[in-house]
Amino acid sequence: MKTVHSASYEILRRHGLTTVFGNPGSNELPFLKDFPEDFRYILGLHEGAVVGMADGFALASGRPAFVNLHAAAGTGNGMGALTNAWYSHSPLVITAGQQVRSMIGVEAMLANVDAGQLPKPLVKWSHEPACAQDVPRALSQAIQTASLPPRAPVYLSIPYDDWAQPAPAGVEHLAARQVSGAALPAPALLAELGERLSRSRNPVLVLGPDVDGANANGLAVELAEKLRMPAWVAPSASRCPFPTRHACFRGVLPAAIAGISRLLDGHDLILVVGAPVFRYHQFAPGDYLPAGAELVQVTCDPGEAARAPMGDALVGDIALTLEALLEQVRPSARPLPEALPRPPALAEEGGPLRPETVFDVIDALAPRDAIFVKESTSTVTAFWQRVEMREPGSYFFPAAGGLGFGLPAAVGAQLAQPRRQVIGIIGDGSANYGITALWSAAQYRVPAVFIILKNGTYGALRWFAGVLEVPDAPGLDVPGLDFCAIARGYGVEALHAATREELEGALKHALAADRPVLIEVPTQTIEP
C-alpha cells in the first residue's frame, strides 16, 4: 500500500529535492522514518542556521531547497532567516511537523495553533492540509508555488499522524507533473521601451539581484555595451549582477533617496532591471528622481512594480525581456564610459589590519569563479571597490539585512556548488547569530573558508549612531570573543592572522584544504 509518506518522497525525488535541511523534533520523526538512501539530511543545531543553509543552497544552485522545521517553536527560530529568504526571492519549501490532528484543537504540547498564519507575511503561500490524503497534493503545490515567478519561500504544516495514512488514488500523477512559467511583456511595450532607450540623450542602467538570479548578467553587459550606458548596482545589493571591473560598472547606489538622485543626476532615462525601486535604508529625504529624468523598471515581481513610488514598469521574465530588448535598441555612437580607477593599496601602521587590506589579499588569492558570501555591513563599500567579481552567482548578502546569514549561507552555497570555492566574509557581530553552522560545516566536511573580520563592535551601528546623533547608545561593542577557540570547539580548523603576511599564508592554506577552515582577522572599524 502506498502511503502519504512514500508518495511525498516520490514527489520530492521527482523535483530533485533530495537534500533536507532540518533540526528534528518529535513531530518530525515520522516524516524521517525509513529515510531514503538517495536523500541526504543536513542537520543544523538551530533553525536559524537551518533556514540560512537552505537559503544559501537555493541561491547558489538556482533550485528550490527543502526545509523541515520543528512545529511552531522551530518555525519561530527560523523566521529571522526567513526575512532574508523572502527578500532574496529564495524558493524555499518549508515544512513543519504538527501535532496529531485530534490533539491540535486542545492545544496539546507542540500543537502549532493557526499554523498557516504563523510565517506570514514572509511566505508566498502557507497552508495546513485539511486531511491526510491532501498532503501529497499540497506538497506538490508548495513546490510549484515556490518555483514559479516571483520565486519565494512557502510553508506547509503537516500533522505527524498523516504520514502513515494511505495515499489517495491517482497520487502518481502528482510526481509526473511539470509546471513552467515565463512571461514576456507585449511586443509593443518592448518596442516602445527600445525606442525610448535609443533616443535617450544619456541613459543609465541600474541592475538588481534578480538579474543574477535569472543568470542574465551577460545580457545586461550586452545592453550596457550596445547603448554605451554606465551600469550601477541597485542599493542594498544582495547579489552581483554585473562584472565589477567592466568599463561600464559604476558601483553600488546608496540606499537613500537623496543619494540616489544625486548620483543619477544628468541622466534623462533610468532603466532599472531586476530590482525594486528602490530598497532604501537610511532616511535621507529628497527628490525621488533627478530633474528631467524618467524611470522604467523591468521586474519579475508584480509587488515590486506596484509599490514603486515613481516611474513606469514592465513585469516579465528578466532574461527573456533583456534578450528581446536587445533586439529593439539601436547601437549608440557614444564612447564607452571610462573604467573606474583601481583603489591603491593602503599602508598598514601596525595594530589591526584595515579591511581594505583584507580584501586586497582576498582579491589576489581567490579563484576566478569564487563565491563570496558577505555579511559585514560596515565594509560593504570597500569590498565592492576592491574584490573583482566576474561570474554569475559570485556574491550573496542578506537581502533583508537580517544577521545570521553569512556562516549558514556559506555552508549551503558550498554544498550547492562543490566545484566552486565559497569564501564567507563575516563580521564578528554578525557571526554569532549563525555560529552553529560551523558544526554542520565540520560534520559534513564542507570545504568553505570563513574569514571573520574582528573589530569588537557592531561597525554599521557605530556609523548609524553618528548619523542619528546617538553617541551614547549602549550595547554596540562585542569584546572578548575568541573565534579560533569557538571554531575548534565545533570541530573546524581555525587560524589567527594579525598581519598581511599571516593572512596570505592562512588563506593559501585554507584554499588548498579539503575541509572547512576559519580565519580570524583583527581589523579596524570603517564606515559603510
Swiss-Prot record:
Q: Which reaction does it catalyse?
A: phenylglyoxylate + H(+) = benzaldehyde + CO2
What is its EC class? lyase
Q: Does the keyword Lyase apply?
A: yes
Bound how, and how many: what does the cofactor note say? Answer: Binds 1 Ca(2+) ion per subunit. Binds 1 thiamine pyrophosphate per subunit.
Names of the cofactor(s): Ca(2+); thiamine diphosphate; Mg(2+)
User: Can you tell which superkingdom this protein's organism belongs to?
Assistant: Bacteria
Query: What keywords does the record list, in alphabetical order?
Result: Aromatic hydrocarbons catabolism, Calcium, Decarboxylase, Lyase, Magnesium, Mandelate pathway, Metal-binding, Thiamine pyrophosphate
* EC numbers, comma separated: 4.1.1.7
Question: Which CDD domains does its entry note?
Answer: TPP_BFDC (cd02002), TPP_PYR_POX_like (cd07035)
Q: Name one Pfam family in it.
A: TPP_enzyme_N
- Chain positions recorded as Ca(2+) binding sites: D428, N455, T457
Enumerate the SUPFAM superfamilies for this protein.
DHS-like NAD/FAD-binding domain (SSF52467), Thiamin diphosphate-binding fold (THDP-binding) (SSF52518)
Region span, Thiamine pyrophosphate binding: 377-460
Protein residues bound to Mg(2+): Q117, L118
Question: Which GO annotations describe the biological process of this protein?
Answer: mandelate catabolic process
Which Gene Ontology molecular function entries are recorded, alphabetically? acetolactate synthase activity; benzoylformate decarboxylase activity; flavin adenine dinucleotide binding; magnesium ion binding; thiamine pyrophosphate binding
Q: Which InterPro entries match?
A: DHS-like_NAD/FAD-binding_dom (IPR029035), THDP-binding (IPR029061), Thiamin_PyroP_enz_cen_dom (IPR012000), Thiamin_PyroP_enz_TPP-bd_dom (IPR012001), TPP-bd_CS (IPR000399), TPP_enz (IPR045229), TPP_enzyme_TPP-bd (IPR011766)
**Subunit annotation:** Homotetramer.
Q: Which family does it belong to?
A: Belongs to the TPP enzyme family.
Indicate what this protein is called per its UniProt record: Benzoylformate decarboxylase
Per the UniProt entry, what species is this protein from, by scientific name? Pseudomonas aeruginosa (strain ATCC 15692 / DSM 22644 / CIP 104116 / JCM 14847 / LMG 12228 / 1C / PRS 101 / PAO1)
Q: Which gene encodes it?
A: mdlC
